[in-house]
């Protein structure tokens, strides 16, 4: 019973930590054109059934990158810096940076582009003081669309970089 109580207290502390980080991130992104934030419960590890609150910051790729490029546009640094400032205040989280593309172009090309874009955001965050040991990157190419690729508006939503901010297990 003591273990359950201790686990509950740790869970409550982690929840409050993520609550505060979410509030600070929402404030930092209040006027952002290129980024949005969402919070959801996710099961991170099927074996332990550890479910946690995960914050996801989504950057619209059109604001960060030119078409077919993984080089950050000058205005992208301001948007990324808003996020970096909050990440630096909350070091007890890990960050999974994922790149996504629309379905235009070959699967191989989109996969490589999504990986390069995720790495570009990671490198910018490192340059802004975020500890590289906290971050991993992954490219999904066109495999995880959030909208239809049949319209330009849908393709625009699918071109994105997401940061999943996950509390570290205490």
Q: Predicted segment positions?
A:
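Solvent-exposed, acidic/flexible segments
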Residues: 2-3, 18, 69-77, 111-114, ...
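Amphipathic, membrane-active segments
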Residues: 19-54
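Short, aliphatic-rich beta-strand segments
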Residues: 55-60
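Periplasmic OmpA-like peptidoglycan-binding domain that tethers envelope proteins to the cell wall
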Residues: 98-168
């Amino acid at each position: 019973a003591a273990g359950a109580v201790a686990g509950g207290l740790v869970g409550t502390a982690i929840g409050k930590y993520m609550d505060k980080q979410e509030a600070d991130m929402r404030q930092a992104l209040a006027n952002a054109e290129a980024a949005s934030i969402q919070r959801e419960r996710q099961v991170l590890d099927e074996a332990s059934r550890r479910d946690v609150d995960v914050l996801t910051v989504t950057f619209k790729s059109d604001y960060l990158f030119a078409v077919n490029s993984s080089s950050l546009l000058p205005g992208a640094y301001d948007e990324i810096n808003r996020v970096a400032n909050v990440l630096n205040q909350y070091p007890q989280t890990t960050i999974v940076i994922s790149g996504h593309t629309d379905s235009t172009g070959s699967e191989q090309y989109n996969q490589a582009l999504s990986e390069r874009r995720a790495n570009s955001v990671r490198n910018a965050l490192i340059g802004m003081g975020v500890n590289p040991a906290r971050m991993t990157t992954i490219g999904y190419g066109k495999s995880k669309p959030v909208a239809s690729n049949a319209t330009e508006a849908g393709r625009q939503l699918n071109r994105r970089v997401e940061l999943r901010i996950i509390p570290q297990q205490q």
